C-alpha cells in the first residue's frame, strides 16, 4: 500500500522522511547554537520548528525539480541531474537563510564552537548536502522498490 501511494503522491514520503532526518540533525547540531543551554521545552519547540521548516524547503525543492524535469517520479528514475538540482536548491536557500538569520534578523546565533565560512555555519551547509542525498537514496531503495 505504501509503495503504491508513494508512486501516486511522492510528496508524502519525501515530507515524512525529510522531517525525521532533519529533526535528528537539528537535535544533533543543537550544541553548536547559542541557545543550547535553554530549557528542554524551548529546545524541543525550536528544533522541531526548524525540522518542519527544513521539510518544507525540501518539498519546495522537490516541487521545483519536478516542474523543471516534468516528472514527479524523478527520485524513482535515479537520474543524476534532478538530484543535483534538488540538493542545489536546498543548499542555495540555506546559504541565504543562515546569512539572513544570523547577520540581518538575528533570529539565532551560533555558539563559538560552530565552524563557519564567511559567517555561515558549515554544519547547516553539510546538512543540506547530506540529507537530500540520503533522502533520495532511501526513497529509491525502500519506497520505490517493486513489490
Describe every region a protein language model picked out:
Residues 1-147:
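Aromatic-rich, lipid-facing transmembrane alpha helices and their immediate juxtamembrane interface loops
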Amino acid at each position: 500500500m505504501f509503495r503504491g501511494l508513494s508512486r501516486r503522491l511522492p510528496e508524502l514520503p519525501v515530507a515524512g522522511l525529510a522531517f525525521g532526518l532533519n529533526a535528528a540533525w537539528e537535535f544533533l547540531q543543537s550544541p553548536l547554537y547559542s541557545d543550547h543551554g535553554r530549557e528542554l521545552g524551548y529546545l524541543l519547540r525550536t528544533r522541531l520548528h526548524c525540522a518542519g521548516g527544513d521539510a518544507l524547503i525540501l518539498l519546495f525543492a522537490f516541487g521545483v525539480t519536478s516542474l523543471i524535469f516534468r516528472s514527479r517520479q524523478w527520485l524513482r528514475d535515479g537520474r543524476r541531474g534532478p538530484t543535483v538540482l534538488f540538493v542545489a536548491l536546498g543548499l542555495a536557500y540555506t546559504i541565504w537563510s543562515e546569512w539572513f538569520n544570523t547577520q540581518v534578523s538575528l533570529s539565532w546565533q551560533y555558539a563559538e564552537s560552530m565552524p563557519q565560512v564567511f559567517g555561515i555555519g558549515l554544519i547547516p551547509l553539510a546538512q543540506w548536502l547530506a540529507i537530500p542525498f540520503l533522502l533520495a537514496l532511501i526513497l529509491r531503495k525502500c519506497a520505490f522498490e517493486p513489490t
